[in-house]
């Protein structure tokens, strides 16, 4: 089994400190595991956590405010619920959400992920969404994208974004980390693209990011993993 496969199937720090594994993995192999774990657990607010992990997220932009909790029975998928206050349609509702990891590729210095995401309103099953979310990152560089096709009883729409960024410095695991990003997003309800700078900070299990544009105003995201 390769290091990549090993990490993908065992994203658990307890594996690293287990003595039997320690004596069977060469020093460079241990370094690779730490590096991939650092990328996997730290840089990006992932829609799937480690096996048995939970994540609480809050989002706010010009379209909606939402609070989203998800639980990951395995590293391959997560299930959750999202409470939404939609500013555009002036309505409150919830989604039952399911996210599945379609593909993950680990190298010595990077990780690539591709996810399927979906949600359904249990009170109005005709209101739902499907989409894709992906990212590629190293400790220095990040790129990501997202796309949603939303079915709504009032009006259907799509929401999409791309994001690129870099870390101005490389901290150690557990340090405060900073990312400087550029994000461009488009919502078919509003038309046109909105591009703006984003700052992201994370330390341990806590992450916050925010950006601002005159057209879309504040775009904020807070996450805590436990």
Give the ranges of each region predicted by the language model.
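Cleavable N-terminal export/targeting peptides
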Residues: 1-48
